[in-house]
Amino acid sequence: MQDLLNVLGLASSANKLISGETLFKKIIKNKIKLVLTVKDMGASQLKKINDKCAFYQVPIYNGLIDTIQLNQAIGKNNVKAIGIEDINFVKLILKNISKGDVNYGQTN
């Protein structure tokens, strides 16, 4: 899991992570290549982001890490969902997910 968190920190430093309302705007504009949500995200917000990603055909992984891990990795507070804009960071993240580096939480 540490490799995934390191990649997220690097992507954050490179300003390739999007969160908050900007995330929804960029999903609509097809700028987001991948969305990650935390294990402890609220049900209504999770449904909203899942529906948006499904409609605009954006890949999403739910519950890979928790809020504390994500916030420490990216250096921000109270972030529950992030979008990755850069395809190279997406490839690194998917590589870490596929090699079993991540403990999967409950996905919806």
Task: Explain the meaning of each model-derived region.
Residues 15, 32-34, 57-59, 79-80:
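Short active-site oxyanion
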Residues 22, 40, 65-68, 87:
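Short, ordered loop/turn segments at secondary-structure junctions
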Residues 5-7, 24-26, 49, 69-74:
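Short, flexible, solvent-exposed loop/turn segments with mixed acidic/basic and small polar residues
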Residues 3, 44, 48, 65, ...:
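Charged, alpha-helix-enriched surfaces in structured cytosolic catalytic cores
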Residues 28-52, 59:
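N-terminal positively charged helical leader segments and presequences
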Residues 71-108:
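C-terminal structural segments of small proteins and small subunits
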Residues 55-79:
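Mid-chain, well-packed structural core segment of small domains
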Residues 3-37:
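N-terminal first-folded block
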